């Protein structure tokens, strides 16, 4: 058998797996000929050209076959949540979770894959590619001494299972505050309606103590003010409770 045929034989035993470059090299290293071959990247390149590896992003591949003609929507539907879980574990182990709009959508049984997802972690700010053209907006919270607050925020989460993978999901109150802080102009109307829907449905369980805790940290005062204004349109009693918390622990913006 040729070198390429030997590597294809190895891959065919791992169809459907997602491998990063190191894992792929390690897998191919089980072939004696590859242990002596220094330029492994060349065989990876040829395997990609022949349809045995589908690139999800730089140095991350789906093991597939030339007969399988994937569309990007199919790939996303089957593998997005697996790739997201793998990315989070590789970067931050278990100190991260889903926040903002997607966290609230998931609570309303909406698992559609958005162009971007917000992830709170203890280290990074910025943007990370998840796969294909889908990105993660990264956010970290620090105190005045620049110390990470991730351990404090990780007290307020729920565990959910999506696509066979477990994720930590921000409490709805935290998700709402981040939505009000970070919502784009294009999504504002949609986000506001989603917040109203959640709060009307779960009025009795709304956690005012969690809002108080956030204000005491010196975080999200503007979001709590926006929430008060939004709630005022459908529930004045709840709005007054929020107003009292703002005046007690921070300040009104008007």
Regions found by a protein language model. Give the residues of each.
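Hydrophobic/aromatic-lined pockets within catalytic cores
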Residues: 29, 48, 108, 181-185
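Short helix-loop-helix/strand-helix junction enriched in hydrophobic and basic residues
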Residues: 41-44, 49, 57-58, 88-127
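Short beta-edge/loop segments at beta->alpha junctions of small alpha/beta modules
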Residues: 2-94, 205-207, 211-225
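Hydrophobic alpha-helical interaction segments
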Residues: 152-254
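Short glycine- and basic-residue-enriched patches
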Residues: 27, 34-37, 94-97, 113-117, ...
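Glycine- and acidic-residue-rich phosphate-binding/metal-coordinating active-site segment common to enzymes
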Residues: 127-128, 133-168
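Cationic, amphipathic, low-complexity alpha-helical segments enriched
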Residues: 81, 92-99, 109, 157, ...
């Amino acid at each position: 058998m040729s070198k390429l045929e030997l590597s294809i034989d190895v891959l065919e035993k791992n169809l459907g797996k997602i491998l990063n470059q190191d894992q792929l090299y390690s897998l191919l290293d089980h072939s004696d000929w590859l242990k002596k071959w220094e330029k492994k990247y060349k065989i990876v390149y040829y395997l990609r050209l022949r349809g045995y590896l589908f690139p999800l992003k730089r140095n991350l591949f789906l093991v597939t076959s030339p007969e399988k003609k994937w569309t990007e929507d199919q790939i996303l539907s089957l593998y997005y949540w697996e790739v997201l879980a793998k990315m989070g574990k590789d970067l931050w182990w278990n100190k991260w979770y889903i926040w903002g709009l997607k966290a609230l959508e998931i609570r309303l049984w909406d698992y559609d894959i958005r162009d971007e997802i917000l992830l709170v972690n203890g280290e990074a700010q910025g943007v990370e590619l998840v796969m294909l053209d889908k990105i993660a907006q990264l956010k970290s919270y620090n105190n005045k001494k620049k110390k990470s607050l991730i351990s404090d925020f990780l007290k307020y989460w729920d565990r959910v299972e999506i696509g066979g993978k477990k994720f930590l999901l921000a409490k709805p109150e935290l998700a709402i505050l981040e939505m009000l802080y970070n919502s784009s102009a294009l999504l504002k109307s949609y986000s506001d309606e989603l917040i109203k829907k959640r709060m009307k449905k779960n009025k009795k369980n709304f956690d005012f103590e969690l809002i108080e805790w956030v204000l005491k940290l010196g975080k999200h005062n503007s979001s709590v003010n926006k929430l008060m204004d939004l709630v005022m349109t459908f529930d004045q009693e709840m709005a007054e409770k929020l107003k009292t918390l703002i005046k007690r622990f921070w300040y009104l913006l008007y």
